[in-house]
UniProtKB/Swiss-Prot annotation:
This is ATP-dependent Clp protease ATP-binding subunit ClpX. InterPro entries: AAA+_ATPase, ATP-dep_Clp_protease_ClpX, ATPase_AAA_core, Clp_ATPase_C, Clp_protease_ATP-bd_su_ClpX, ClpX_bact, P-loop_NTPase, Znf_CppX_C4. ATP-dependent specificity component of the Clp protease. It directs the protease to specific substrates. Can perform chaperone functions in the absence of ClpP. One of its GO terms (cellular component) is HslUV protease complex. SUPFAM superfamilies: Glucocorticoid receptor-like (DNA-binding domain) (SSF57716), P-loop containing nucleoside triphosphate hydrolases (SSF52540). Belongs to the ClpX chaperone family. ATP binds at P116, T117, G118, S119, G120, K121, T122, L123. Keywords: ATP-binding, Chaperone, Metal-binding, Nucleotide-binding, Zinc. Residues 1-53 form the ClpX-type ZB domain. One of its GO terms (molecular function) is unfolded protein binding. One of its GO terms (biological process) is cell division.
């Protein structure tokens, strides 16, 4: 509080009121501000903050908009996309809401994606981050170990997110982290062991704090922590964690639980051979995850469990051709740059999908199959300006015949050369 001066009456530099007219006058270097002006400034700041929050809420895509965006990149999995859209919308609504300490506390809801290899778990998480324009990082749970053992500390996951945000901590604190192969850190046996399980239960324990929300100390260069280094501090309260895993064998655990019980109006659950694995997974309960080897505390921190269906042949054909980043569209664009039209026969696409199913790699295996098929023709075409069209047939996929090539006449070749010259100049 400024001291009273008999010779000169002190005034607020903003409103002009004297010290006698206000409760308090705060002195600065050559200026004064009264308590009334401080309150007014606080009100202005609060109003602007509320406007920013309202704008953030208006900009947040609604669940239907989120699903529509996911539909552009991910084929099938409608139920999973709906569940993810609602969960992500609620998560960012919670961050952007003006929740006061005396109101209802909205807890964070991390997500567990459960589905076969190549069913779209990673792609779903990546696409969500792309839509929301937030930093995104992928971590592999199999590389993590408990602190003090050879391997990566869980804090290194956070470092990847910070790096994705260009070291903007505030942005990173609203990012998304996808932890893949989370099923591989299941406890080695259902009963707690007296020996250390440093890559299983130990990692689950280490992840608990950052999943729930804590101020984590992250080594800026990665690697192990040591007491004499500086740390980057990051609050994980608003980071959305999406954990994904195939959880192979969990369908048997679910079946053993519900197999003899009736569902609906006394209908018995069919055997695994008759029942689709995807349908069985829809009946998953926390107790099944517990039996699989996930610890109760971990299960409690990923309350939203989303199951993905195994991909069918038709799904894989659609994945090849329909999404914005479909592999066939990408190859067509690459060929177009060389002035060649690329076509895939329907039987060729069906066979590629069948090969991916046989390998058990799902959508992930499609690119490897296509690269193998396309290598020779992509090597030859740029050097031959007479080629106008390339058709990939079933025989091409089976490697019993090369692609069908259509050659242009001399007039077209001349126009093609002229077009190339124009683009270079």
């Amino acid at each position: 509080m400024a001291k009273y001066d008999d010779h000169k009456q002190l005034k607020c530099s903003f409103c002009g009121k004297t010290q006698d007219q206000v409760r308090r006058l705060v002195a600065g270097p050559g200026v004064y501000i009264c308590d009334e002006c401080i309150e007014l400034c606080q009100e202005i700041i609060n109003e602007e903050f509320e406007e920013d929050m309202d704008m953030a809420m208006r900009d947040l895509p609604k669940p239907k908009e989120i699903k529509a965006f996911l539909d552009q990149y991910v084929i099938g999995q409608d139920r999973a996309k709906k569940a993810l859209a609602v969960a992500v919308y609620n998560h960012y609504k919670r961050i952007n809401s003006k929740v006061k300490s005396d109101d209802v506390e909205l807890q964070k809801s991390n997500i567990l994606l459960l589905g076969p290899t190549g069913s779209g778990k990673t792609l779903l998480a990546q696409t969500l981050a792309k839509l929301l324009n937030v930093p995104f990082a992928i971590a592999d749970a199999t590389t993590l170990t408990e602190a003090g053992y050879v391997g990566e500390d869980v804090e290194n996951i956070l470092l990847r997110l910070i790096q994705a945000a260009d070291y903007d901590i505030e942005r990173a604190e609203k990012g998304i982290i996808y932890i893949d192969e989370i099923d591989k850190i299941a406890r080695k046996s259902e009963n707690p062991s007296i020996t250390r399980d440093v890559s299983g239960e130990g990692v689950q324990q280490a992840l608990l704090k950052i999943l729930e929300g804590t101020i984590a100390n992250v080594p800026p260069q990665g690697g192990r922590k040591h007491p004499h280094q500086e740390f980057i501090q990051i609050d994980t309260t608003n980071i959305l964690f999406i954990c994904g895993g195939a959880f192979e064998g969990i369908d048997k655990i679910i079946e053993s639980r519900i197999g003899k019980k009736s569902l609906g109006f006394g209908a018995e659950v069919q055997s695994k051979k008759e029942k689709d694995v995807g349908e069985i997974l829809k009946h998953i309960m926390p107790e099944d995850l517990l039996k699989f080897g996930m610890i109760p505390e971990f299960i409690g921190r990923v309350p939203i469990v989303v199951t993905l269906d195994p991909l069918t042949k038709d799904d894989l054909v659609r994945i090849l051709t329909e999404p914005k980043n479909a592999l066939v569209k990408q190859y067509e664009k690459l060929f177009e740059m060389d002035g060649v039209k690329l076509e895939f026969e329907k039987k060729a696409l069906d066979l590629i999908a069948e090969m991916a199913l046989e390998r058990g790699t799902g959508a992930r295996g499609l690119r490897a199959i296509l690269e193998d098929i396309m290598l020779d023709v992509m090597y030859e075409i740029p050097s031959d300006e007479t080629i106008e069209k390339c058709i990939i047939t079933e025989e091409t996929v089976r490697k019993i015949a090369p692609p069908t090539l259509v050659y242009a006449d001399a007039q077209k070749i001349g126009r093609k050369k002229a077009k190339k010259t124009e683009s270079v100049s």
